[in-house]
Amino acid sequence: FLGGLIGPLMSLIPGLLK
């Protein structure tokens, strides 16, 4: 479960912050 979320989150969170 978490493994599937970590991937997208690592790509989305930095993208939103920038």
UniProtKB/Swiss-Prot annotation:
Annotated tissue distribution: Expressed by the venom gland.
Location in or out of the cell: Secreted
Source taxonomy: Eukaryota, Metazoa, Ecdysozoa, Arthropoda, Hexapoda
Keywords: Amidation, Antimicrobial, Secreted
Cellular component terms per the entry's GO annotation: extracellular region
Top-level taxonomic group: Eukaryota
Function of the molecule: May have antimicrobial properties, like most ant linear peptides.
Residues with Lysine amide modification: 18
Residue ranges of the TM segments: none
The protein, known as: U1-poneritoxin-Da2a
